[in-house]
Amino acid sequence: MRLIFGHDEYIANAVGQALGVTIHPPYTAIGFADASEVIRGGAVFNNYNGSNIELTMFAPRAVTKGLIRAIVNYVFVQLECNRLSARTKRSNKPAQVMLPKIGFKWEANLKAYYGKEKSNDAVLFCLDRKTASERWLNG
């Protein structure tokens, strides 16, 4: 996969549409394109507060190590964040399996975050600077 930069609004809209959510600016985005230059997914970063930034991501295929390193480099090296947060619907079991495999830790369940039904609760995960450095930057 090839990484695409400089098309934040287009990528954020594509990710939001794929996930059925609206992503509000300000944000920065990295797109994932296939060999034919078609954007197949993306990572959108928003709600930056100096210490934390949130990740909204859509990737129809497996997430590659190169992609994870690009995300970790942006968040922990360029922005110098202490943590990266990711929320997913309780019903999104693939994300809940993948996030811990790449170093995210469960933090909380957020009741009725996406809607009334229990399947619309959110699950909050965090990747901290120490884990990111050990697994993705220095490892």
Language model segments and positions:
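Conserved catalytic-core motifs of GNAT/GCN5-like acyltransferases
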Residues: 105-122
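Conserved beta-strand in the GNAT
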Residues: 37-46
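Conserved beta-strand-loop-alpha-helix junction that forms the acyl-donor binding cleft
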Residues: 86-96
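Conserved GNAT acetyl-CoA-binding A-motif
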Residues: 77-88
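A short helix-loop-beta-strand connector motif used in the catalytic cores of GNAT acetyltransferases and
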Residues: 20-34
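Conserved acetyl-CoA binding element of GNAT-fold acetyltransferases
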Residues: 48-61, 87
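Short amphipathic alpha-helix that is part of the acyltransferase structural core
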Residues: 1-21
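Conserved active-site tyrosine of GNAT-family acetyltransferases
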Residues: 98-99, 104
